[in-house]
Every structure is written in C-alpha cells, then in structure tokens.
C-alpha cells in the first residue's frame, strides 16, 4: 500500500548533505528533552545564518512561525509532550531542519526522536570534516544512531524516495517498506541497522551486527557509546 503526502516546494538541493539522527526515549523521560534547546543548538552549529529558514511550522501546520526566534519564544507549544513534528525549510537553498517524535503504541511507552539536518555546512567528504561534525553532534545530545548521505536531485530526504511533481504541487509516496523501517528503528539500541551509508554513527550493538566486510571501512572510536564508520 502506498500513501501520498504533500511536501514544501523548494529549490532543488544542490551539493547538500543530509544527516539523520535517532535517539530512543521513554514516556517517563520524554519531559527531560528540551525541544527549544535542541533547535537552538542545531541551528547555531550547523547553519551559517542565525535565521536560515523562511518556512517554519509545528505539528504539521498547527502553527506557522516567521523565524526561529519566534518559534523558540513559544515555550508552551515546544513542550516535548505536545510536539510531534517541527519542520524548518529554506525554500531557496533547500536547507532543512526537521524534528519528529514517533510514539509507538497507544500507551506511548516507547518514543523515537528523529532529527533531519540538510545543510551546506555539512562536509562529509573529508575524514577530518566527518569526525568534527560527529563530535559536534554528540555535544548536542547522546544519540543512539545517525547516518549521512549526499542528497541527489529529486530526492525527498525524509523518505529517501523520489519526489513526484504534479501540475500545482509535489508529493512523495510512502511505501510499506519505509513504514516498516521506521518501526524497526525503535530497536536501534538492540543493534538494528537499516543499511550502511557514506557516514554512520553506530552504537556498540550495531557495530556487532554489521556485515564482516564492513569492518574494512574506516572506523573511528567517538566516545564510550558510539563509533564513526565511513564508507566513502
């Protein structure tokens, strides 16, 4: 079964890298996440302009904002228990910051935090640049998993599928494979790895589960929890 959802139209992303980050949360610890601080830190570290976005919305259009500053001032709405999705886009450059909370089950016992970065400041070609970015990322939060790739023309970063252009809008199809993958990402702490990308931040369990030939790629010990695996 395939579903369609509407997306922002923007300039084609050229020479941009994307990084997706994941953190496993629980209902009892969800309130510990400061969404405002997360947004502020990511914008400061990975976007050159202090106000890099012209399309900002929360919870799929529940409210729109004219700037990051106005978003951060809305502290009540930024509660991690009230936020399910934040989307920030630069319609000219194609740069993006997307934050999503995926709640598993009606009781919301398990929550997966996903952050998507698309920025011209992400240089994942050089080893030194990749390690620097990895260190910056772990200074923001204790991630459980992350990966990065270059955005090809016509690719929707969220679903990693091709964008369909219609007469007056654009859309992407959400496949059953994508839906199943998002469910399995709740098991990253148990070693689940969807696939290897040019840039990977893996936890210890994931390192144990990757194919043996992957051990030939460049590996770097990042901290007590994570490794960087480069497959360029």
Mark where each language-model region is.
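C-terminal interaction module
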Residues: 1-54, 156-232
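Internal, hydrophobic cores of structured domains that mediate oligomerization or house catalytic pockets
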Residues: 49-162
């Amino acid at each position: 079964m395939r579903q369609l959802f509407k997306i922002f139209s923007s300039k084609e992303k050229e020479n941009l890298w994307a990084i997706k980050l994941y953190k496993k949360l629980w209902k009892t610890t969800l309130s510990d996440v400061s969404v405002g601080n997360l947004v502020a830190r990511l914008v400061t570290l990975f976007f050159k302009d202090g106000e890099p976005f012209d399309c900002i919305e929360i919870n799929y259009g529940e409210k729109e904002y004219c700037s990051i500053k106005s978003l951060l001032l809305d502290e009540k709405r930024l509660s991690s228990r009230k936020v399910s999705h934040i989307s920030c886009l630069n319609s000219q450059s194609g740069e993006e910051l997307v934050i999503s909370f995926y709640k598993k089950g009606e009781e919301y016992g398990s929550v997966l935090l996903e952050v998507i970065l698309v920025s011209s400041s992400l240089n994942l070609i050089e080893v030194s640049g990749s390690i620097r970015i990895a260190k910056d990322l772990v200074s923001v939060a204790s991630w459980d998993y992350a990966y990065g790739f270059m955005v090809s023309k016509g690719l929707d970063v969220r679903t990693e599928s091709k964008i369909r252009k219609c007469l007056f809008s654009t859309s992407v199809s959400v496949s059953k494979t994508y839906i199943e993958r998002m469910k399995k990402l709740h098991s990253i702490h148990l070693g689940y790895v969807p696939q290897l990308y040019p840039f990977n931040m893996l936890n210890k369990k994931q390192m144990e589960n990757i194919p043996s030939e992957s051990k030939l790629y460049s590996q770097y010990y990042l901290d007590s929890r994570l490794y960087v695996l480069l497959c360029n």
